[in-house]
Amino acid sequence: MSYQEHEKTIQEISNYIEQHLKDDLPLQTLAKHAGYSRFHFHRMFKKVIKKSVVDYIRERRMIQAAKDLIHTDQRAIDIALQYRFSS
């Protein structure tokens, strides 16, 4: 598979992550969606996105939670729990 094909696959997975930020996103599930082993998926994701999968998901959840804090009347604890941040 060429780098461009890997890049396209990882972009599709990052879109999937964006749509499911409030859901559990285990590495194994994401790798399966990409059609890669966990190891290969983790390696390719980091190569394309320049961050580990876990760091990327955490960052995207933080950004979305911050937007929700600004633009909604939801309590901070409710937003934190929606985006899977624990106390």
PLM regions and their residue ranges:
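Short coil turns linking two alpha-helices in DNA-binding domains
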Residues: S37-R38, S86-S87
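Terminal helix-turn-helix DNA-binding modules in bacterial transcription factors
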Residues: E7, Q11-Q28, K47-Q82
